A protein has these predicted regions:
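Surface-exposed, charged secondary-structure patches
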Residues: 1-11, 130, 153-194
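Low-complexity, intrinsically disordered terminal/linker segments enriched in charged
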Residues: 5, 20, 25, 29, ...
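Intrinsically disordered, low-complexity segments enriched in small/polar residues
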Residues: 7, 27, 38-47, 69, ...
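Hydrophobic residues embedded in beta-strands of well-ordered beta-sheets
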Residues: 10, 30-31, 185, 215-216
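Short, solvent-exposed loop/turn segments at conserved positions within beta-propeller repeat blades
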Residues: 14-16
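Active-site-adjacent structural elements in enzyme catalytic domains
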Residues: 128, 146-163, 192-194, 209, ...
């Protein structure tokens, strides 16, 4: 049963009934159910998770404002150790796409195609998006990308057939927070991965700097190792230069 709140009351707007193949209740307070599928079934996965134990209201609000807009899909910011000194593992192209939507409410205006599309994005456009949410200078952004200093553009290749991502990624959940003396926020985030029936697939500490005008920046992320953590197998890195040439050079 899918329930949404309306006028401070729960309203059921979808109902389904099925035989549970497996179920699990976690210490954290999640109930996971797996729908039975016959051998050979190739449809959508049947795992569903429900949080039974209520989550702190402030944690939910912080999650909605700072974490859910980025999430775990098509970027590695929440699954990578990074700060303003060590950031080489971040993929600025992934973050450009995600943060463009966060900033403007629409997708980047550069479409992928079967033959491997390639664009030259003006430096002001690319850097403005990244610098809105991350504390990096123009020089640092240029070092982590393919930047053409002659025409002041960034080479941008949308993801395509060969680096598309697994569709059933986890969703983030802020489980605790701390406001530091300098005004920054430290959020402890756990990944709830329904298809693996895990409520702590990845745990990390994300540092955020809220601004007076309501905007914010991500400052760093630290992955917390745990026996309950899983490999972030949903994330697909973009093609390397060699892989891109191998797959698209003849198109």
């Amino acid at each position: 049963c899918q329930v949404k709140w309306k006028d401070n009351s729960p309203q059921a707007n979808y109902y389904d009934e099925y035989e549970a193949y497996e179920w699990k209740y976690t210490e954290k307070g999640y109930l996971f159910l797996e729908e039975y599928h016959p051998p050979g079934f190739d449809g959508a996965p049947g795992e569903t998770g429900f949080r039974v134990q209520p989550l702190d209201k402030t944690c939910r609000e912080l999650n909605r404002k700072y974490v859910m807009p980025l999430g775990y899909a098509l970027n590695n910011l929440l699954i990578t150790n990074w700060d303003n000194q060590n950031y080489t593992e971040l993929d600025f192209y992934d973050l450009y796409e995600k943060m463009y939507y966060m900033k403007y409410g629409k997708q980047v205006p550069y479409e992928a195609n079967y033959g491997g599309a390639e664009y030259e994005v003006p430096e002001d456009e690319f850097e403005e998006v990244i610098k809105t949410y991350l504390p990096f200078s123009n020089t640092e952004i240029e070092k982590g990308t393919f930047y053409n200093s002659n025409n002041k553009t960034f080479r941008y290749r949308p993801r395509g057939l060969y680096d598309c991502e697994f569709p059933y990624e986890p969703y983030p959940e802020v489980i605790s927070y701390e406001k530091l003396q300098d005004g920054t926020l430290k959020l402890t985030i756990e990944a709830v991965w329904e298809i693996r029936m895990l409520d702590q697939a990845i745990t990390s500490e994300l540092m955020i700097k809220p601004m007076e005008d309501g905007s914010f920046q991500y400052l760093s992320n630290k992955v917390i190792k745990s026996d309950q953590n899983a490999n972030a197998g949903w994330y697909m890195p973009r093609l390397t230069e060699e892989e891109w040439e191998e797959n698209y050079s003849n198109n």
